[in-house]
Amino acid sequence: MKEIKGLARVKFLPGKLEEWKRLTEQAMEIVRTKDKGTLQYEIFFNADESEAIVFERYRDSDAALEHFANIGHLMAPLMETATITGELLGDPNEQIRRNLTGDQPKLFTPWIALSDEQPAAK
């Protein structure tokens, strides 16, 4: 399983939702035009837009690193708009593992799966 998945949980600071939306629209444009290995990049809101989930899928560790390099300049401004926690899912390469300091994001490695790579029996 080479794919890397990310799940970010976002709780907006008071009055910062519109700024976060503006910044994530910039991020989405970068993903669309510069990222080569991003397979999925979706944002979901709860009913009152006080929280969001960002779901990301990358072809492999190199694609995830490319994405982080492309949007890195947006991370500090985004962190000023919300409390963000997250999970990284997959078996990332050593470069990504070295960058995982502290407790965020939390890394979860594969155990068992039903996916396109390992479909159910017919």
Report residues per predicted region.
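A short hydrophobic/aromatic micro-motif that marks alpha-helical segments and, especially, helix-coil
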Residues: 74-76
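Short S/T/G/P-rich N-terminal loop/turn motif that feeds into the first structured element of a domain
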Residues: 1-52, 59-70, 79-122
